[in-house]
Amino acid sequence: MVKWCDFTISPFHYFTISLTLYICLMIRKTHLITGGCGFVGRNMVKRLQATTDAQIIFIDDLSVGTHPDTWLKAAKTSEGEGFVIYDNRLLFIQADVLHVMLGFASDSDYFFSRYNLDVARINDVFHFAAIVGGRSKIDGDPMAVALDLAIDAHMFYWACRYLPDRMMYPSSSAAYPVDLQTVDGAIALKESDINFKKMGEPDMTYGWSKLTGEYLAKIAASHYGLKVTCIRPFSGYGEDQDLSYPVPAIAARAAKREDPFEVWGSGNQGRDFVHIDDVIDCILLAMDHIHDGTAINIGMGRLTSFNEIIQVFCKIAGYEPTIKPLLDKPVGVHSRYCDMSFVEQRLGWKAKISIEEGMRRVYEAAVAKSV
């Protein structure tokens, strides 16, 4: 017989109780999402809400992100100083993620100490918190973007000591050498085009910070045993993306039938546009198969110019405006798109949503918002 707590139970019952507890713990996981109110973060929150019964903790200081009251379809069940709980399993903490990570590093029971919330263990970590804001931010305030270095360093410092089950680190297509993305030298970028032993120059401080994050991920995996996946998403877009990004901004202007239609630069510069639903699909699949810090591309593998995007939206809107180039505006590299062969071979994954279908969804959302 086995003595457990104040009860004497048989080995069979002990096994049954232990198995039940184990199954409950395995089923009821807790996931952490930093930057959980930003574009990608909130889409991950909504996906996990819809497809799992896990407890979800998402952190955002709302400097750029949108409060979950405006986009989360869930009942508010509790709230306190600095946090809100929805449906008894989605916990939103309004805070600077740097402060939270510093608190975690010094106190393993930080959530209880700070918020009086009992969080036994964090299983998956989705680290989306970053200083972002599109091309104008990357070129216009590069030192602010460099703060991403501090955010990522503190996150990996905590993760290497806490060791969650899995972690996802979002790098960026901006980490690729800019000399591979010129007018004459543009190529479909392969994962192997980034080589830490033979470095090219990434895109501004944002690219450098993401490249450094990838390096930290490799160190975390090899030296500390952290199971980490890195992604290099290209130009993600979606219906609820902020208007500071080109796709929703172009859609909104097409919905208003702007004519002449202004475009930054010549409009011939191109990107690899991929819908947010496809991005989330690929992230979740990659986390099941990649744990050593290897970085993968997420894109369509197709170069589409901004002039072509304007044409798609205006065709949907049913008019043909005159295009007006704004040559004094920042445009970044000329051409950035990816080679998806590694992902197709390693994960068997391809994006499902075509440019035409994705842009139609964005346009319809823009029309709905303008009503």
Residue ranges and their predicted role:
Residues 16, 21-236, 365:
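N-terminal Rossmann-like NAD(P)+-binding domain of SDR-like oxidoreductases, especially those catalyzing
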Residues 4-18:
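Intrinsically disordered, low-complexity proline-rich regions
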Residues 30, 44, 76-91, 95-96, ...:
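C-terminal substrate-binding subdomain of Rossmann-fold SDR/epimerase-dehydratase oxidoreductases
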Residues 65-67, 177-179, 239-241, 306, ...:
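A short beta-to-alpha transition loop/helix N-cap that caps and shapes the active-site region
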Residues 179-190, 211, 215-287, 301-303, ...:
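NAD(P)-dependent short-chain dehydrogenase/reductase
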Residues 155, 217, 250, 343-344:
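Structural element of the ATP-grasp superfamily
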